[in-house]
Regions:
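Local sequence-structure signature of Cys/Sec-based thiol-disulfide redox active-site neighborhoods
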Residues: 1-28
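Long, low-complexity, intrinsically disordered polar/charged segments
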Residues: 1-6, 58, 79-83
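Short alpha-helical
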Residues: 13, 39, 64
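Thioredoxin-like thiol-disulfide oxidoreductase module
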Residues: 34-51
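Structural micro-motif
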Residues: 48-58, 67
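Non-catalytic, surface beta->alpha helical segment in thiol-disulfide oxidoreductase systems
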Residues: 61-83
């Protein structure tokens, strides 16, 4: 199973939803809490080109935020991506 990296911030409903979906899938992930750390937030923005939370990477592939991950699940593509 591919390793997931998720950049989050505290008290973020989208972050919580994304983590819940990853847990449902049994995905291995590293959570990087970047909300109050300027260096980590800068790293997230450099990697993703976005400044909103969460930002999710499967391996080195940026899939976007929670809405994009939910769309992949709805379209039946998330399992395949996580299995790679």
């Amino acid at each position: 199973m591919a390793h997931v990296t998720i950049y989050t911030r505290p008290f973020c409903g989208y972050c919580s939803r994304a983590i819940s979906l990853l847990n449902e899938k049994g995905a291995e992930y590293t959570e990087i809490e970047a909300g109050f750390d300027p260096a980590l937030r800068q790293e997230m923005m450099r990697r993703s080109g976005r400044n909103t939370f969460p930002q999710i990477f499967v391996g080195e592939t940026h899939i976007g935020g929670c809405d994009e991950m939910v769309a992949l699940e709805r379209d039946g593509k998330l399992d395949e991506l996580l299995a790679a």
